[in-house]
């Protein structure tokens, strides 16, 4: 006798998915074309057909705890070839956005970031923190003066680190709490659905899987397997490597400042400065390409979350480069102003990272790692 499964539809979940870009959900009649044409779907329990079925039934828990929603790169192959005009890629993107909110705490920040009416608040918060903390500590000087433009004379590096080091700890803590639940949930889901035979997660084996999957992420191999939006890999790689480059630059100059006591501004002939400038330009160009791609792809859904992130990344790059260019042009007021605005963008990017679409960098990496670790498509040896 077949086992029984009690279906408990979540109508509110269906409503949210429709609002966030998955409004084509009801067009699906489960023909499985999407799973067949998807070039990156696994052989064992392929997606996205089963996700479309579960979403139409409002099976929130089954979807949010599945790592398969993160394996999708929203390339658009399935949406283009769907005979009914459904868009599985957009539906899975909406489910991922929902999952990010589920795993990030406190929920208040998730609601704040996802509400376009509260966008000004996201910029007011760091502005108030900078001014109040800067004036209280005396590390913010609105009249730096001097013959040379030195941003640390206006906004002290001590103030920067006083704000951003605890902020980094905050982000790591939120991700740690979310990932602990996330890994446990996707493993339980994989076991119950037959996607893995490993009863427990071996930390050493998981780390080995992570090391193995990193080259795939850095080369964007999954993007290049797609047909419809293969060109997206270029802009995504530009932004990814820009962030990696800027991360390296930040850490090098941190050591240079606090270990060797060498203060900026640094020479344009400095190789590290070259890396910073190249990464900054690539960030602007890459994010601009993403914006252009979003505008041109009228058949694909772009939500407020997409535009918020793209605007944030583009603004981050533009204000950073403008800060430097106005300094070189000896325009003190403009340079200090753009530097302050740039720090607001940096604050937004990091403080709200666990709650924004950018969190997919972390969750997708872990999901890809788990998929590698689970040996999902491993063939049993012939007897």
Each model region followed by its residue ranges:
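Secondary-structure capping and boundary motifs in well-ordered enzyme cores
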Residues: 27-30, 64-67, 71-74, 277-280, ...
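Short, well-ordered alpha-helical packing segments
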Residues: 52, 69, 76-79, 92, ...
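N-terminal signal-anchor module of multipass membrane proteins
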Residues: 2-30
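Membrane-embedded alpha-helical bundles of multi-pass integral membrane proteins
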Residues: 103-383
């Amino acid at each position: 006798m077949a086992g029984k499964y009690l279906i408990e539809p979540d109508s509110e979940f269906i409503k949210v998915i429709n609002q966030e870009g998955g409004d084509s959900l009801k067009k699906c009649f489960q023909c499985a074309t999407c799973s067949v044409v998807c070039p990156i779907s696994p052989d064992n329990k392929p997606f996205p057909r089963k996700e479309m079925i579960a979403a139409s039934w409002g099976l929130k828990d089954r979807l949010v705890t599945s790592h398969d929603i993160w394996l999708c790169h929203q390339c658009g192959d399935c949406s283009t070839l769907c005979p009914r005009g459904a868009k599985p890629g957009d539906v899975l993107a909406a489910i991922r956005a929902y999952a990010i909110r589920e795993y990030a705490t406190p929920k208040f920040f998730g609601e704040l970031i996802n509400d376009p009416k509260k966008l000004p608040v996201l910029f007011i918060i760091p502005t108030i923190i900078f001014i109040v903390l800067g004036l209280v500590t005396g590390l913010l000087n609105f009249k730096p003066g001097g013959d040379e433009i030195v941003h640390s004379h206006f906004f002290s590096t001590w103030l920067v680190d006083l704000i951003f080091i605890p902020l980094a700890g905050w982000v790591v803590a939120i991700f740690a709490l979310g990932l602990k639940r996330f890994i446990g949930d996707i493993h339980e889901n994989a076991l119950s659905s037959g996607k893995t035979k490993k009863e427990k997660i071996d930390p050493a084996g998981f780390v080995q899987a992570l090391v193995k999957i990193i080259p795939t992420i850095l080369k964007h191999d999954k993007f290049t397997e797609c047909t419809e939006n293969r060109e997206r890999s270029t802009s995504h790689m530009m932004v990814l490597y820009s962030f990696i480059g800027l991360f390296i630059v930040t850490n090098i100059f941190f050591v240079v400042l606090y270990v060797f006591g060498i203060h900026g501004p640094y020479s344009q002939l400095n190789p590290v400065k070259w890396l910073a400038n190249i990464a900054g330009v690539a960030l602007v160009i890459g994010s601009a390409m993403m914006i252009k791609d979003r505008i041109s792809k009228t058949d694909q859904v772009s939500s407020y979350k997409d535009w918020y992130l793209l605007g944030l990344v583009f603004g981050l790059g533009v204000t950073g480069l403008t800060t430097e260019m106005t300094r070189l042009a000896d325009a003190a007021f403009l340079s200090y102003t753009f530097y302050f605005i740039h720090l607001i963008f940096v604050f937004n990017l990091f403080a709200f990272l666990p709650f924004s679409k950018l969190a997919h960098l972390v969750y997708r990496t872990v999901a890809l790692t788990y998929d590698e670790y689970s040996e999902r498509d491993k063939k049993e040896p012939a007897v």
